[in-house]
Curated annotation (Swiss-Prot):
Top-rank taxon: Eukaryota
Signal peptide feature range: none
Protein's cellular compartments: Cytoplasm; Golgi apparatus membrane; Cytoplasmic vesicle, COPI-coated vesicle membrane
Any one of the GO BP annotations: retrograde vesicle-mediated transport, Golgi to endoplasmic reticulum
Listed Gene3D superfamilies: 3.30.450.60
Organism: Caenorhabditis elegans
Name assigned to this protein: Probable coatomer subunit zeta
The keyword Protein biosynthesis is assigned to this record: no
PROSITE patterns: CLAT_ADAPTOR_S
Keyword terms of this UniProt record: Cytoplasm, Cytoplasmic vesicle, ER-Golgi transport, Golgi apparatus, Membrane, Protein transport, Transport
Lineage of the species this protein comes from: Eukaryota, Metazoa, Ecdysozoa, Nematoda, Chromadorea
Amino acid sequence: MADFDTNPTSLYSIKGIVILDQDGNRVLAKYYDRTTFGTVKEQKAFEKSLFSKTSRNTSADILLLDGVTCLYRSNVDLYFYVLGSTRENELFLDATLTCLYDAVSVVLRKNVEKKALIDSMDTIMLIIDEICDEGIIMETDAQAVVQRTALKSDEVSFSDQSVSQIGFSFMKSANEQFKWSLLK
């Protein structure tokens, strides 16, 4: 991974995305800058410091902490953070944070709370991967991100379907395969 501070790219990039709960505990974190956040211990220490600064000051939504530009947004029991270089354009960091929050809000049906987020963690991870690839901001349109991460009707898990729906789907598929084998 490239050093984000000494090797600038022409692409907009971030150092990490973090979601903490109301107690400052990590719910989800994805760091892209291995020089600033090399170990889990360093990450946790940064998160603790970040939470202590942001939980007291709910009026601001941006701060500079340890040479990292931090944009954040709080909701019922969650804090969403986008971390960037001090040279990074704050408007793009804000667009990334807004995209993350809006996409999560759509997926969770506006129920942006810790329990709902944990229940949909797989989709939330997909959202983060669609927004950012190895630190490079790829998308800032929440609707586009949600569309790309939405499950297709054929990909719905068995737990989300009734037994009759699974049986009907299986029979329909078997029937189509049988028809094609007869036509050959």
